[in-house]
Amino acid sequence: MNTVFPRIQRLPPYVFNVVAEMKKAARARGDDVIDFSMGNPDQPTPKHIVDKLVEAAVRGTDSDYVKPEHLNEEGTHTHRYSVSKGVPRLRRAMANWYKRRYDVDLDPDSEVIATIGSKEGLAHLAFATLSAGDVVLVPNPAYPIHPYGVVLAGADVRHVRLTPEVDFFEELERAIKETWPAPKMLILNFPGNPTTQCVDLGFFEKAVALCREHQIWLVHDLAYADIVFDGYTAPSVLQVPGAKDIAVESFTLSKSYNMPGWRVGFMCGNPTLVGALARIKSYLDYGMFTPVQVAAISALEGPQDCVGEICEMYRSRRDVLCDGLNAAGWKVEKPKATMFVWAEIPEPFRELGSLEFSKRLMDEAKVAVSPGIGFGEYGDTHVRFALIENEHRTRQAIRGIKRMLKRTNT
């Protein structure tokens, strides 16, 4: 029997699975591991969103009381199949969210599609638009689905270095000139995971102009639009005039509303790309459970105080972690956005590389982080902390790290 699966063979070990095995082994030894390894929000979803889910799920089965929002596309009860692109009411809520936030006008029918989390949308967009021989430009380091969605689609990735010591646009322009065949797509993510890098609207104006000049599709992952600090505001690429001619943008409710397990996201912008994603999804899924879509409408259109509270929680955790690490002798910068801290490995450990250093942190400090190598070769000088532990546990982690650093320096 043929057991050669070329598509799978192109994939390296997934960073989160590697770290999960390390945590499993440590806990089997009885270690109390303080876990900063995965950006998986630890707090519950706001109550009004959960209440709407329950209401839609329960009342959607009651023939004596069925509201219009409890119906799927065909006007039948919510426990039946939905539609892959999302019910119209949800797509309108998504379009309205963009209008309120960015003053961007979107057609809910042709320029908005609901996705089962942003990760699914990004991967299936690659499947819908790419094939063998196509080349996609992806920053390095990057969130794994950005390059490996391309790989799974059978296309090729051209990595573009994204580190403080280089000019990203110089690197990008060189990559465009040196790549043959010409790149078909550019994938961006700001505020960035894992690097936490932030940009202004001028950055997107330049990116859109460059992509228009070279006829390159632009895909932007805006997962951390709401998780911003110290007065920073994350721009949307769709704010750039003419961006919809060549660009789409994805967003997820996972971080802004503490809904990671719900798997709710959307992609907006260029109708050709949105249409391609809608077509391939029509063959692959029937969309989210309709009560989840009803609850997502409540999230987008209901009280937004919860978003500010979630952001403030991450800011406070950021301050505790960064202040504590700096006091312990591990110099890190406070990020202006995201739920991560991207920390350069301390000098005495730098030659280990990020994977071995992560193992040392686990063994000696009982702290789990993500090794930067899992996000690309240019990430190997760093590790990523996800701000998913409370402040008490974070201070406990800092004490363990401080002891580890002190042993090394003596």
What are these model-predicted stretches?
Residues 96, 100, 350-353, 360-370, ...:
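PLP-dependent enzyme catalytic core of the Aspartate aminotransferase-like
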Residues 297, 312-322, 332-345, 379:
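Conserved glycine-rich beta-strand-loop-beta hairpin in the small C-terminal domain of fold type I
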Residues 26-29, 153, 213-214, 328, ...:
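Helix C-cap/helix->beta junction micro-motif
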Residues 128-150:
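Conserved PLP-anchoring active-site segment centered on the Schiff-base-forming lysine
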Residues 158, 162-230:
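Active-site phosphate-binding strand-loop segment of PLP-dependent enzymes
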Residues 53, 239-240, 244-315, 319-328, ...:
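Conserved core segment of the aminotransferase class I/II
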Residues 2-116, 124, 300-302, 408-410:
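N-terminal small-domain helix-loop-helix segment of the aminotransferase-like
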